[in-house]
Amino acid sequence: MGVFRFISISLAAVSAANAAQILSMPHAQTVPNSYIVMMKDDTSDDDFNHHQSWLQSTHTHNITRRATVQNAGMRHKYNFHKMKGYSGVFDDETIKDIAKDPKVMFVEPDTIISVHGKVDQNNVPSWGLARISSSKPGTQDYTYDSSAGEGITVYSVDTGVDINHEDFEGRAIWGSNQVNDGDDNDRSGHGTHTSGTMVGKEFGIAKKAKLVAVKVLGNDGSGPTSGIVAGINWCVEHARQNGGTNKAVMNMSLGGGSSSALNRAAAQAVEQGMFLSVAAGNDNTDARSSSPASEPSVCTVGASAEDDSRSSFSNWGPSLDLFAPGSNIISARPGGGSQSMSGTSMAAPHVAGLAAYLMALEGISGGAVCDRLKQLGSASISDVGPGTPTNVLINNGGAKGDGKSPKPSPKPSHPSEPQQPTEPQQPAPGEPSTPAPAPMPPTPQHPHTPFPGGDDFDFDGFWKKYFGGEHWRKMFSSFFN
């Protein structure tokens, strides 16, 4: 008995010593009792399946023993490339048990992620398209090659998209809804606006690219990190089954506090060959504090104003790769027409659209795209902010110049009013069903032609809606410049 007790104590000590780290998120708004668990890279499918079976029984045992009504359990499962993991609602004891599994890399509290844009004033000129095909500000035409992104698929990871908007010409499809609200629409307007900049006939850069809507944020422009990781997972798998990840672009005009889980998911997507354009954030602060903007392998985008200055709200710092137009940008509005919005959310889709354009024109893909954008860009931006290693504004390099965009509308066709949050609906218990990858539509034949303010966040509504009732390079690059 004494020997058995000694062995048990020794094993417990070893388990505690090797326990995975339960990360803290002191500067982020966390979702109570909701966590993201990441497994180690060498975790096999069998190991992962065994862990899930163990988790289910352990979670059930712990909530029964504590007689708690909190019984949500696992919500999302992640399994793409080298990344395996899951998210869910668990009690403290279950989280401690999870961390003891030697196959677990880390456990991270689930946090709130938000859009990086806001509806702005109307009656402003549309200038972003013209600026990225000109050597100086103040021009009116957008000159581009007629390939216009044909054969490339762009994933809008956002608030959803009005796929029936006339500017998309039938090239947009609905992909996945990770919000689990049963509403495959864009009630916010944010995702439709960013998508118009990427692929719209009038407002867009890659005018022949296809668009897939992946809803990860709700009507109030916010959502949990766990759902965004699930959205990335879905995009990678869909791209693999439909044309390949080397012909895919993902735009993420969103962000929140630093998240190892979100950065890891973004890095895995890039490693699989996708190009990721990410908004730097709207807090006029160092973007290293935000995810996924702080992930080195993505292309992190700051916002510029019409006079080629950094937009006053735009984040800055070593994480930034490029600048793109982000102030007073006119693009598509749900239900038809247009509206003006500002934010790094508006800058990132300029980069995503131009990435799709160059991938079709030059045959490049993945990590090479951000470097190519830097080569083609112009050193134009003033007041880039402390420690920012770039003042490059994106430019399409003149391309072949055999196409010309129609001049966008001089003002929004609808008044621009702030979108009011809608009372969220209670999701069904358990993990949300993820639709099977949707088939891509045939390519149509065409002629050649912000972080929202924290004080406005409805936490009670959010809770009801979702739960019922190479990092070092950017981090330290400023020290070596």
Curated annotation (Swiss-Prot):
Biased composition (Polar residues): 282-294
GO terms for MF: serine-type endopeptidase activity
Signal peptide: 1-19
Protein's cellular compartments: Secreted
EC numbers for this chain: 3.4.21.-
GO CC annotation, single: extracellular region
Superkingdom of this protein's organism: Eukaryota
Keywords: Glycoprotein, Hydrolase, Protease, Secreted, Serine protease, Signal, Virulence, Zymogen
One Pfam family named in its UniProt record: Inhibitor_I9
Compositional bias of kind Pro residues: 424-450
Primary localization: secreted
Peptidase S8 domain boundaries: 126-400
Residue ranges of every copy of the Inhibitor I9 domain listed in the record: 34-115
Top enzyme category: hydrolase
Glycan-modified residues: 251
Prosegment location in residue numbers: 20-116
Protein family according to the UniProt entry: Belongs to the peptidase S8 family.
Name assigned to this protein: Subtilisin-like protease 1
